[in-house]
């Protein structure tokens, strides 16, 4: 019996092909997008859950006050660990100091590769519950020369051999012993880039690290901890908050624990307070996914209820031939469920087909969780729910008709029967227009920041890590590069042009407020740095080897000049807490070295030979491949065993827009789908209205109505609904996009033309959709339509 209901339902789907296509394709698109967004959200929420101690791991962070600004950083001073251990040992199960992650060269026999690694204390593998394939958590890093490598690094060097106790040379001159191998960390771990762990005891032998053991002013290290079983993050934070103020009162440091579960989604801080982070995108895309799914469901329900009003006579015939109400209820529900199940199956195919594109768009490596029972439970549950809700109107309302009334055709929809459908159409286009506006605002903000002058020329500028060999023979290295004819200039620097790796707060100058402790970026460089990057001197002069006094010279950016309060700063002195005197020789235009959306940090540029990077300006007109080959030849002359790893400055700068560009692309993708689903629904509704008014259209044409008049008749009511949607979407979009733009110091204005353009675009798309079916109805033969009616 049940089978017959679904057979009849299938026949009805086939009979009404256009109606079925619109219903199934629209609902499948909405479901598919909701599944994709759901997979993306689950991936974001899964970050760091790989680590068994996920809920009890934290990193120590610090808020420091510089003038009227509070800076938040994960870098802490070296003596903090012992202070915490001596005073609050009962709150911590384990603690481990760590360096920052950077590339090291590793050599086994004659094989040499460069891999990211970090120096860590022995408890590090245990805190993060690394899955040890060889060796043990407890003693893997206990020896002074212990090295723990990832499984992929082990395969690169040893294949299937056991690497334990084998010798590995790192950074060209340190002999280490492999004492452990850990399973590669998944991409959804914050530590996924780390492939080698080096012994902390060896790190402590470096002079600058030794000098930091008691220095509370040198925030250059990381401290990870696993708290005790009964401890609470908030309670520990309240205890340790002011522990460093007595040692370094200048910046009023306040320490706190950030739980590992917040590292990925809550990574942004503003003026000492957590300002969210990627959790914003989780909420945003989650809401968008629900809205688009809602739009698809609206279409389905709208068209289902609209079509059901034409089936009153069918209900009368079936009742007259003996059908009872219960059978009709089951029949209508069977038809609705057949549609939703077909849509769900189609949505799974769409998801599988579009997943590579979506992964590329979202910069992910996601897959559909086919084996997860919750996935099927949620999908089938939602499908059944949607089918039951959409089928409830015809099932419960139409099945209640008296057969005589239905057969006579005296059934008429109520005066306000179309009102719910109109409201739902308005909702659909409100969401669609809002998404279009949001996409344009995000795009404008990106272009606004991209068009901001960066203060230097990054075209053809490459940067590579310096080595001891290059630093010791820099002038010879520079000379050899210039002789190749493919390079216009070379320089060394302590920071890349796309970041500032050094900061100080101890500088003073004439007229400075003693209570003011601004954080100033400090970049050490060689004489040719300005020429290499093409900065612009606006006052004074550049560094020059003709002036021996330049060894104590400093060049300020505009932001630093404004900080001093003197436009005539050139020629004046700046000193630090060690009474070192720097004389200002020049001022350069602001360089965007950090976020292009933020205010420029005051920065000092000084001469120094202790640089970590080499900046190379390639000559224009020389093919890049040829230029790089020549540079590599010189590099290998000085570093025959070090891999030639370089980065283009313009590409590194472009990465600063990655999140916003991704958001813009996803928003455009979502907006396109939303408007497509809305137009599918509009097309279905105008088809239904044209079918309902066939006799009226025929009479009007017989009486002389033009095609344009008939098109206007069928379209005007729907265009009014789109206009109402536009009027609602504008203030809603303005409110949310204004709030979003407030996250950026350097931001675009909300322009009125974007709202108008979004409205006109929505009206145009709606008009095209309406015109197709309206014109078809208008050119139909009136005699045929009147005879049919």
Question: What residue spans do the PLM features occupy?
Answer:
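Membrane-helix entry/capping segments
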Residues: 1-11, 15, 19, 51, ...
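Intracellular coupling helices
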Residues: 6-22, 26, 296-339, 400-411, ...
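Short, strongly hydrophobic transmembrane alpha-helices
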Residues: 16-45, 418-445, 456, 681, ...
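Small-residue-rich transmembrane alpha-helices
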Residues: 32, 36-39, 256, 336-403, ...
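A hydrophobic alpha-helix feature that marks transmembrane segments and, especially
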Residues: 38, 287-315, 389, 394-395, ...
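Membrane-proximal juxtamembrane linkers immediately C-terminal to transmembrane helices
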Residues: 42-65, 88-90, 131, 190-191, ...
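Hydrophobic, regular-secondary-structure patches
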Residues: 44, 58-113, 123, 155-160, ...
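Mid-to-C-terminal secondary-structure elements
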Residues: 121-134, 147-280, 476-659
């Amino acid at each position: 019996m049940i089978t017959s209901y679904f057979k009849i339902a299938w026949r009805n789907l086939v009979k009404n092909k256009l109606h079925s296509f619109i219903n199934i394709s629209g609902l499948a698109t909405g479901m598919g997008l909701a599944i994709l967004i759901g997979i993306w959200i689950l991936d974001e929420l899964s970050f760091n859950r790989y680590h068994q101690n996920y809920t009890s791991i934290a990193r120590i962070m610090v808020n420091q006050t510089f003038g009227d600004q509070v800076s938040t950083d994960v870098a802490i001073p070296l003596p903090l660990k012992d202070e915490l251990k001596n005073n609050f040992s009962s709150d911590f199960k384990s603690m481990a100091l760590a360096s920052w992650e950077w590339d090291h060269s590793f050599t086994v026999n004659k094989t040499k590769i460069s891999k990211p690694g970090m120096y860590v204390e022995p408890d590090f593998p245990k805190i993060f519950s690394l899955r040890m394939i060889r060796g043990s958590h407890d003693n893997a890093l206990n020896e002074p020369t212990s090295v723990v490598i990832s499984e992929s690094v082990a395969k690169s060097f040893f294949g299937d051999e056991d690497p334990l106790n084998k010798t590995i040379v790192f950074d060209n001159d340190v002999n280490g012993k492999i004492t452990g191998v850990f399973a590669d960390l998944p991409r959804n771990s914050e530590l996924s880039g780390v492939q080698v762990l080096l012994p902390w005891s060896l790190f402590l032998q470096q002079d600058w690290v030794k000098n930091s053991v008691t220095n509370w002013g040198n925030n250059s290290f990381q401290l990870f901890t696993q708290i005790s079983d009964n401890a609470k993050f908030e309670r520990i934070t309240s205890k340790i908050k002011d522990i460093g103020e007595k040692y370094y009162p200048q910046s009023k440091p306040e320490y706190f624990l950030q739980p590992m579960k917040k590292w990925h989604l809550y990574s942004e801080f503003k003026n000492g307070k957590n300002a969210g982070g990627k959790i914003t995108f989780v909420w945003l895309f989650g809401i968008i996914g629900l809205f688009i799914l809602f739009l698809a469901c609206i279409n389905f329900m709208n068209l289902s209820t609209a079509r059901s009003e034409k089936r009153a006579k069918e209900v009368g015939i079936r009742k007259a031939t003996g059908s009872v109400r219960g059978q009709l209820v089951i029949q209508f529900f069977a038809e609705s469920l057949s549609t939703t199940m077909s849509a769900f199956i189609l949505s799974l195919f769409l998801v599988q087909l579009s997943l590579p594109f979506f992964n590329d768009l979202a910069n992910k490596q996601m897959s559909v969780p086919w084996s997860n029972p919750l996935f099927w439970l949620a999908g089938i549950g939602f499908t059944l729910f949607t089918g039951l809700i959409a089928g409830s109107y015809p099932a419960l309302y139409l099945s209640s008709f008296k057969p005589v009334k239905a057969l006579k055709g005296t059934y008429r929809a109520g005066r306000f029967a179309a009102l719910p459908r109109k409201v739902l159409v308005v909702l659909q286009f409100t969401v669609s227009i809002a998404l279009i506006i949001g996409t344009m605002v995000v795009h404008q903000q990106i272009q606004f920041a991209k068009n901001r002058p960066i203060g230097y020329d990054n075209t053809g500028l490459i940067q590579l890590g310096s080595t001891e060999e290059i630093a010791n023979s820099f002038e010879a290295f520079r000379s050899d590069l210039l002789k190749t004819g493919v390079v216009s200039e070379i320089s060394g620097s302590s920071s890349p042009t796309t970041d500032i790796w050094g900061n100080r707060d101890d500088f003073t100058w004439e007229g400075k407020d003693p209570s003011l402790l601004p954080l100033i970026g400090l970049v050490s460089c060689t004489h040719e740095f300005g020429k290499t990057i093409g900065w612009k001197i606006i006052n004074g002069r550049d560094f020059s080897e003709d002036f021996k006094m330049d060894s104590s010279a400093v060049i300020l950016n505009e932001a630093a000049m404004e900080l001093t309060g003197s436009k005539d700063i050139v020629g004046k002195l700046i000193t630090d807490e060690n009474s070192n005197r720097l004389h200002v020789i020049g001022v350069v235009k602001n360089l965007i070295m950090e976020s292009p959306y933020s205010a420029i940090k005051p920065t000092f540029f000084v001469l120094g030979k202790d640089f970590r990077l080499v900046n190379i300006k390639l000559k224009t007109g020389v093919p890049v491949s040829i230029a790089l080959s020549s540079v590599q030849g010189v590099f290998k002359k000085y570093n025959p065993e070090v891999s030639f790893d370089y980065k283009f400055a313009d590409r590194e700068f472009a990465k600063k827009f990655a999140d916003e560009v991704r958001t813009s692309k996803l928003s455009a993708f979502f907006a396109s789908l939303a408007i497509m689903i809305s137009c599918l629904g509009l097309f279905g509704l105008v088809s239904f209205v044209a079918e309902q008014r066939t006799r009226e259209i025929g009479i009007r044409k017989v009486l002389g109505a033009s095609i344009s008049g008939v098109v206007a008749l069928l379209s005007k009511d729907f265009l009014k609904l789109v206009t109402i949607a536009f009027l609602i979407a504008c203030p809603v979009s303005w409110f949310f996009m204004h709030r979003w733009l407030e996250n950026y110091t350097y931001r675009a204005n909300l322009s009125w033309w974007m709202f108008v353009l979004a409205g006109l675009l929505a009206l145009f798309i709606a008009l095209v959709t309406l015109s197709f079916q309206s014109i078809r109805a208008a050119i139909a033969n009136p005699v045929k339509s009147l005879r049919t009616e």
